[in-house]
């Protein structure tokens, strides 16, 4: 696997998240009843950052929760022989709320589908939207993101690597070839 290109640096990621924050506010006509739910691992810190930007623009703190979708994956046995199964409980009441799922990369849509299932098991939100930093195409399910930081068309042989400062010590999006 070798680096093909660096696609987003720290400044580009910050600009993308700033734009996504404005789009979320505009599309929802404000921030009332919005809950951001970040998919573990990298979706959660992105959701926290979106919440910070929205608070900066609107003066309102948006609740942020995380969801572990491990139990909801349809490829659980492909991930590991002994997967780490965590409680998928979301620590924010999402019933009747405008839930926005946040993730780093949208690829096949299977992770997004698992997150939707996990959220619906916690209660019935008013609606669910999806925000992603990168949409790389190759969807296998009829799911699309409502908010996209960057569309990056890829081949199935390419790998998108997202690094988030809170987890990886740096912010970047890179594309690799196998």
From Swiss-Prot:
Q: What is its EC number?
A: 2.4.2.9
Q: Name one GO biological process term.
A: DNA-templated transcription termination
| Key words of the record | Glycosyltransferase, RNA-binding, Transcription, Transcription regulation, Transcription termination, Transferase
Q: What chemistry does it catalyse, as a reaction equation?
A: UMP + diphosphate = 5-phospho-alpha-D-ribose 1-diphosphate + uracil
Its domain of life?
Bacteria
Q: Which GO terms describe its molecular function?
A: RNA binding; uracil phosphoribosyltransferase activity
As annotated in the record, motif PRPP-binding runs over 99-111
Asked if the keyword Transferase belongs to this entry, the reply reads: yes
Presence of the UniProt keyword RNA-binding in the record: yes
Q: Which InterPro entries match?
A: PRibTrfase_dom (IPR000836), PRTase-like (IPR029057), PyrR (IPR023050), PyrR_bifunctional (IPR050137)
Residues noted as binding substrate in the record, renumbered to the chain: 41-42, 103-111, 136
Q: What disulfide bonds does the UniProt entry report for this chain?
A: none
* PANTHER family associated with the record: BIFUNCTIONAL PROTEIN PYRR
Family statement: Belongs to the purine/pyrimidine phosphoribosyltransferase family. PyrR subfamily.
How this chain assembles, per its entry, is: Homodimer and homohexamer; in equilibrium.
Role noted for this protein: Regulates transcriptional attenuation of the pyrimidine nucleotide (pyr) operon by binding in a uridine-dependent manner to specific sites on pyr mRNA. This disrupts an antiterminator hairpin in the RNA and favors formation of a downstream transcription terminator, leading to a reduced expression of downstream genes.
What is this protein called in UniProt? Bifunctional protein PyrR
């Amino acid at each position: 696997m070798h680096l093909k290109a660096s696609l987003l640096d720290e400044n580009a990621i910050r600009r993308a998240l700033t734009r996504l924050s404005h789009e979320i506010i505009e599309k929802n006509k404000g921030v009332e009843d919005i809950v951001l739910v970040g998919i573990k691992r990298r979706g959660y810190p992105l959701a926290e950052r979106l919440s910070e930007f929205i608070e900066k623009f609107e003066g309102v703190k948006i609740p942020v929760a995380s969801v572990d979708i491990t139990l909801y994956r349809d490829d659980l046995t492909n991930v590991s022989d002994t997967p780490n199964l965590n409680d998928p409980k979301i620590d924010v009441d999402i019933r009747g709320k405008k839930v926005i799922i946040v993730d780093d990369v949208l690829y096949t849509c299977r992770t997004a589908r698992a997150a939707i299932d996990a959220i619906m098991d916690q209660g019935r939100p008013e609606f669910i939207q999806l925000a992603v930093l990168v949409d790389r195409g190759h969807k296998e399910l009829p799911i699309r993101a409502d908010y996209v930081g960057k569309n990056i068309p890829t081949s199935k042989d390419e790998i998108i690597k997202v690094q988030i400062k809170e987890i990886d010590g740096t912010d970047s999006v890179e594309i690799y070839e196998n």
